[in-house]
Amino acid sequence: MVAFSDKQEALVNGAYEAFKANIPKYSVVFYTTILEKAPAAKNLFSFLANGVDATNPKLTGHAEKLFGLVRDSAAQLRASGGVVADAALGAVHSQKAVNDAQFVVVKEALVKTLKEAVGDKWSDELGTAVELAYDELAAAIKKAY
């Protein structure tokens, strides 16, 4: 069980709303960061075959889904102290052989993107809340393998 406060959930929700304010822009930031840190990740995402394109609905849709899952993770943590991931999500990550290092790269890209999205509203408290929500989501996905 993880203690997650109402304030932490609100911080994560606010960051998600900032991301949603310009999904194409922040999707590009997110995937560009991933590819800078781990160029081989291009092979994990079929929609990156032609590079990072803000007009690609699969790119923006996947980013929105991931950021939404982190927001949902925060809600689950506040409500129950744990996160449960859909079995299909675990199966996809297992099939793609996503490893711990790749989860770390995604977390770093997520944090960088949200930091840019919220601008001067970024704080250590927000960063901690986002990282905790993501870490618990990643653990739940791995458990669902």
Curated annotation (Swiss-Prot):
Root nodules. It comes from Vigna unguiculata (Cowpea). Pfam families: Globin (PF00042). O2 binds at residue 62. One of its GO terms (biological process) is nodulation. Disulfide bonds: none annotated. The modification Phosphoserine is found at residue 46. Heme b binds at residues 46, 65, 93, 96. Belongs to the plant globin family. The modification Nitrated tyrosine is found at residues 26, 31, 134. InterPro entries: Globin (IPR000971), Globin-like_sf (IPR009050), Globin/Proto (IPR012292), Leghaemoglobin-like (IPR001032), Leghaemoglobin_Fe_BS (IPR019824). One of its GO terms (cellular component) is cytosol. Keywords: Cytoplasm, Heme, Iron, Metal-binding, Nitration, Nitrogen fixation, Nodulation, Nucleus, Oxygen transport, Phosphoprotein, Transport. SUPFAM superfamilies: Globin-like (SSF46458). This is Leghemoglobin-1. Residues 3-145 form the Globin domain. Leghemoglobin that reversibly binds oxygen O(2) through a pentacoordinated heme iron. In root nodules, facilitates the diffusion of oxygen to the bacteroids while preventing the bacterial nitrogenase from being inactivated by buffering dioxygen, nitric oxide and carbon monoxide, and promoting the formation of reactive oxygen species (ROS, e.g. H(2)O(2)). This role is essential for symbiotic nitrogen fixation (SNF).
